[in-house]
Design a protein with these regions (language model features):
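Active-site/ligand-binding-proximal alpha/beta "capping" segment
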Residues: 203-254
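RNA substrate-binding interface of SAM-dependent RNA methyltransferases
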Residues: 5, 109-210
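Short, aromatic/basic amphipathic alpha-helical patches
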Residues: 67-78, 240
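Boundary-proximal intrinsically disordered activation/regulatory segments immediately upstream
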Residues: 1-68, 156-157
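Structured adenosyl-cofactor binding patch, chiefly the S-adenosyl-L-methionine
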Residues: 103, 141-145, 159-173, 238-275
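Anion (oxyanion) recognition and catalysis
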Residues: 49, 75, 196-197
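A glycine-rich helix N-cap at a beta->alpha junction
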Residues: 75-94
Length: 275
């Protein structure tokens, strides 16, 4: 039976994950086993539950208890459900709740690059992508378009930040991912060495004099390919491009020379994810 608790004190410590903890505090790098992430909307929460993540608590509009989010409650056991009217919850969190519900989950244990890539044929590698909306959109495309895993370098946005999770529509729980390198200094040199040791050829999505078209037949023939995507503004670092086996471009019309990284990822995954 749901453990429903009416909110009477905005300063109650059990509401900290929703109201006062920063993303870094939620992530808890010093004690990752105590880390938390927040999922938003019934569909996204349902996908987190499907993936086996343990719920810690929920924050829910009062009307959702018997409304569209009611099914979620039956799946969350005795996790406390903190509730109030929509306006009070918006005042508490600082934003309007998507579909009237948030859920705090325990973060999963970090996975290793070796574990994820052992049997993978196509992986995406994200370098320095800090916009959570783009990270979420890239994960959604990766799930839909045949990527076996996503690797992020240490300067990337956390894929489990609330907005990235929401934009991904919960697909961040469906595509395996791991951080490649422990510190920014490990990328690109050590990261590239690791990918090559695992049998991958690397393809930098970038414009250069040696760029090949994304439909180049040699790319399709590679048994294991890592597609490397760079930050929104400057793209990939020169050192990263130089370390990759291929530099790949997307042919474009009307004088357009680039796409947003999320759009470019969808095109790249569609073309290079064919197996």
């Amino acid at each position: 039976m749901p453990n429903i608790i009416e909110i009477t004190d905005f300063h109650a410590p059990e509401l900290d994950p929703y109201a006062r903890l920063t993303q870094n505090q939620l992530r808890n790098r010093l004690e990752p086993e105590k880390g938390i992430f927040i999922a938003e909307s019934p569909k996204v929460i349902s996908r987190a539950l499907d993936a086996g993540y343990p719920p810690l608590s929920l924050l829910m509009e009062r009307k959702q208890i018997t409304g569209p989010a009611a099914e979620i409650l039956t799946r969350c056991g005795d996790a406390p459900v903190y509730t109030a009217d929509r306006e009070l919850l918006a005042a508490l969190t600082g934003f309007e709740l998507t579909r009237g519900v948030l859920c705090a989950f325990r973060r999963p244990a970090p996975r290793s690059v070796e574990e994820l890539c052992k049997n993978a044929r196509r992986v995406a590698v994200l370098e320095g992508i800090v916009d959570s909306t783009n990270v979420g959109a890239i994960f959604r495309s990766a799930a839909a378009l045949n990527m076996d895993a996503v690797l992020i370098n240490p300067s990337c946005c956390d894929p489990l930040c609330r907005r990235a999770v929401r934009v991904s529509m919960g697909t961040v729980f469906q595509v395996p991912w791991a951080q490649i390198g422990q510190t920014p200094a490990d990328w690109p040199e050590k990261g590239m060495e690791q990918l090559h040791a695992l049998g991958f050829k690397t393809a930098a999505m970038a414009l250069s004099d040696r760029s090949v078209s994304i439909d180049d037949e040699q790319l399709a023939r590679e048994p294991k390919l890592a597609i490397v995507l760079g930050t929104e503004g400057d793209g990939l670092a020169r050192s990263t491009i130089a370390a990759c086996d291929y530099t790949v471009k997307i042919p474009m019309s009307h004088g357009v020379d680039s796409l947003n990284v999320a759009a470019a990822s969808a095109v790249a995954f569609w073309q290079l994810g064919k197996q």
